[in-house]
Amino acid sequence: KVLNYTVNLFERLGKILPVHIIVGNHDIWAKKSNEITSIDSLKWIPNVQVYTDPIMYNWSDRKILLMPWRRDSAHEAETLADNPQSEIVFCHSEVRGIYLNSKVKNQHGNESNIYDKYTRVYSGHIHYRQNKNKLLMVGVPYQLTRSDMNNPKGFDLVDLETMEETFFENHISPKFLRYNIKMLYDIPLGNFKKQIENNFVDLYVPSEIATTSALSNLINKVQKISRRIEPNIYQEDNMIDKDLYDIDEIE
């Protein structure tokens, strides 16, 4: 079913515009080889190209390097060195010092300054969208786990002539949200329902409230609106993570 949907999607895209796909590490069967990939089925679709090896294009009078996943950081550095004329790079790279989530940095790969000489570099691989100097980690198009909370997801449109970038945020796919029930008392229920619709919700509840009817009443009113709502009971004296009280999404 998934393969059928994917092929159908790229068939439709191929009828609209040329599609260029670089292989990522989750697409390959062997850890250090791009020879066998899960997206080989797409390469037979008209107007769709799948790249397992680097290739250089001249688009809008700019040298564009498409660099799929390399077997290690040394191989990646070698590929970049072999294409010194590149101006813009589209890649799937592991970069040291890039955030994996809001708090943890990646400790593997090349340093980000390896890309400083380029006009712009767009990379996948790291799910957490972020910008560092010339490098844009585009992230995943939708939230996958709680680690993606509050990190914008979507896709980018780049004008290669002007290098103007337009980000289209994904407001359709489910998101992970976090609320504290004490902060909801003065919020209209309709507003709360609208925000949690189709989303995954962590609801933090002080133990003294969990034993009252307030929690069950709220759950009964909203549980069919969200994808899932999970109450998390805590002892208020032990609550030291101030982030749990942040409900800036509510207006």
Segments from the language model and where they lie:
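Conserved beta-sheet core of the metallophosphoesterase superfamily
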Residues: 96, 101-167
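Divalent metal-coordination and catalytic microenvironments
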Residues: 6, 24, 64, 125, ...
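Active-site neighborhood of phospho(di)ester-bond hydrolases with catalytic His/Asp-centered motifs
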Residues: 1, 18-25, 49-54, 67-68, ...
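Binuclear metal-dependent hydrolase catalytic cores centered on His/Asp/Glu-rich metal-binding motifs
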Residues: 59-113, 182-185
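Core catalytic region of metal-dependent phosphoesterases/phosphodiesterases
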Residues: 1-56, 114-118
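Short, conserved loop/helix-junction motifs that constitute active-site signature segments
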Residues: 13-15, 80-84, 112-117, 195-196
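Active-site regions of enzymes building and remodeling cell-envelope glycoconjugates
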Residues: 47-49, 62-64, 86-89, 103-104, ...
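Accessory, non-catalytic peripheral segments of nucleic-acid enzymes
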Residues: 160-251
